[in-house]
Curated annotation (Swiss-Prot):
ATP binds at residues 13-20. Signal peptide: none annotated. The keyword Nucleotide-binding applies. Gene3D superfamilies: P-loop containing nucleotide triphosphate hydrolases. This is UPF0200 protein APE_1753.1. HAMAP family: UPF0200 (MF_01111). One of its GO terms (molecular function) is ATP binding. Pfam families: AAA_17. Keywords: ATP-binding, Nucleotide-binding.
Length: 187
C-alpha cells in the first residue's frame, strides 16, 4: 500500500491538450519534480544506439511495449524513481501504466487534460514542424495515443480539465487539481 508521501500525479491527454503546461504548474504548486514519460523512451532509444528522431523514438516505444507489455514505459520509469519521493508525470499513456506505479507503492492521482481537436491543432501549429501537414500529424498522433490507451486514462482520470479557455483558466484549474491530489477530495 502506498504511503501518503509517495504520490504520483500523472497527467494524461492527447497532443496539444496542454498536459505539459498542467504538469509544470502542478509540480510548481506542490514543489515536486516533473518526470516526462517520453524522456524514458528517448533515453532508451539512445541506449540502443539510435538517433532519437521522432521515428526512432516511436519505433523503440513500440518495441518496448512488445518486449515488456503495454505498461513498458512505466515499468522502466518505476525503476528510476527514488523510493519515498513524490513526482508529477507528464504523459501517462494508459491505465496499465498507472497500475504499475500503484503496485510499486505510489498513490497515483490522474489528471486528464482535454481540448477539442481544432484547438489542439491551433496549438500544434504554433509549435510548427516541417514535413507532413499538421492535420495528418495530429491524426496519426491521436490514433497512436488512443491505441496506447490515452482515451481510457482520460475517461478514468481522477480530475478532468477541459482546456478551452485562457492560459489563466488553465493555470487556475491545474492549481485546483494539485490541491485535490494532495487532499484526496474537494479543494
Amino acid at each position: 500500500m502506498a504511503s501518503p508521501n509517495r504520490l504520483i500525479v500523472a497527467v494524461t491527454g492527447l497532443p496539444g491538450s496542454g498536459k505539459s503546461v498542467v504538469a509544470r504548474i502542478v509540480a510548481e504548486e506542490l514543489g515536486l519534480e516533473v518526470k516526462v514519460m517520453g524522456d524514458v523512451v528517448r533515453e532508451e532509444t539512445v541506449r540502443r544506439g539510435l538517433e532519437p528522431t521522432p521515428e526512432n523514438v516511436e519505433r523503440v516505444a513500440r518495441m518496448l511495449r512488445e518486449e515488456l507489455g503495454r505498461a513498458a514505459v512505466a515499468k522502466l520509469l518505476a525503476e528510476r524513481l527514488e523510493p519515498g519521493r513524490s513526482y508529477v508525470l507528464d504523459g501517462l499513456r494508459s491505465v496499465e501504466e498507472a497500475e504499475v506505479l500503484a503496485r510499486a507503492g505510489w498513490r497515483v492521482f490522474i489528471i486528464g487534460v482535454y481540448a477539442p481537436r481544432k484547438q489542439r491543432l491551433e496549438r500544434l501549429m504554433r509549435r510548427r514542424r516541417s514535413g507532413e501537414t499538421l492535420w495528418e500529424v495530429l491524426e496519426l498522433r491521436d490514433a497512436s495515443n488512443i491505441e496506447l490507451g490515452v482515451g481510457e486514462a482520460l475517461a478514468l482520470s481522477d480530475y478532468l480539465i477541459v482546456n478551452t479557455g485562457s492560459l489563466e483558466d488553465l493555470e487556475f484549474e491545474a492549481r485546483r487539481a494539485a490541491r485535490v491530489a494532495i487532499c484526496g477530495g474537494d479543494p
